[in-house]
Amino acid sequence: VLFVGNPGPPETRRRLTIITEGGTRTATGMWHAEELKHASCQGAVERHSWPEGDKPGLLLYSGPGVEAARAQGTLRGSYDEGKTWPWKQTYYEGGSGYSDVCVLPGGRVAVLFEQDGKSNLGFTVLPAPPPQPPGAK
């Protein structure tokens, strides 16, 4: 999954596409991720796990959790290769801008982010996300 970015106001949704063959071919057209609405801001995407058998893979996205401001840092999860983002966890309630994500041993997730402005960095480690989407059996 490639995050094409956000063209800026008035559009607030991230655009995504699938790239295959080592990055040489676009496998799909672009689509908007309805759940990833936010003020124009760099976010981070990281693969937490690959699909295996009947178990879905998990993509993570970190960015502002609100549409109107760089605030409420939120980690989101997609279990269908970026089509939907049903799982989310807020990691910081205040000002939260650019971020990066890293999957740690055991599945926990580290997030480094701009905290309360561009002069401060925040860092947090979150528990491993659920292996299945919310409501799955």
Predicted segment positions?
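Asp-box/BNR beta-propeller blade signature and adjacent active/binding-site loops
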Residues: 1-137
